[in-house]
Amino acid sequence: MRALFLIPGDAVDQVQALPAVAAVAQQLKFAIQVACAPAVAGVWKLLPAVEKLIPFNFGDASLADWANLLGSVREPDFQLCINLAGGRQVDLMLSMSHIPTRLAAAGFSATQKVNPATGGWPAQALAAYLQPIGVSHDADAFRLVLPREALAEATSRLPAGDGPMLLLSPAGVPGDWPQQRWQELPSRIRTSLPGLRSLELGPADAAHVLERAAMVAASDVVLASDPLSEELALLCGVPMVALGRDGDSLPQRPGVKGLTAATGLDALTPEDVLAALGLA
């Protein structure tokens, strides 16, 4: 039996859906197909349970694109569709499909509508889509299982030594924590922790998400304002401080903290960040 997930959005949206998709595959023993934008399809390399990706640009699809998608979802024998997209076109397409169970937050094509929680960690909010089909969902318990080769390659890229490894991942966008502070922070830490190893990486992208996930998993702690690196750290179970992110949008787990400032990230001092890292 097969399940179809329609998941619009960017790479962060895809990563946040990984635990829910994995839960359906594991608990129902369904084969999984995912429709998502081609630019973010690389994220699904992280989940071997996905048997097929259907590249689809939800935001600017033509009528011909929708017709092609209908053809794709009519051919396999799908028993379930979890629809995170919205709009009349997707409803028309699904209403003409032969999928008997169609779950969505809204839309006339849904055989059952769900009410996702607002607030909290978005990955856990998808539990609302799984409850009607008897699938339990604890996103915080999910962990990525990465290929041994990818982890070995990541380890080879880290600084030599046996001290704790701090991975820095700034977003590199206007309003980010100032670049000079990112660069100076490791030196500040080494005054009390001489063996610290550190590496700064630019923003993650979907095309290289496996490599970034492996770098995160090979580290001891992550300091990030890059949203994709943050989500990967959560799914790898690596301690993390997320700059610019409210703690309520993160799982309530030891070692995971959000750090914000009312007037912007440039108001955060190195001491604020050190305290969040437990190094003050």
State the predicted function of each range.
Residues 1-280:
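Catalytic machinery of carbohydrate-active enzymes
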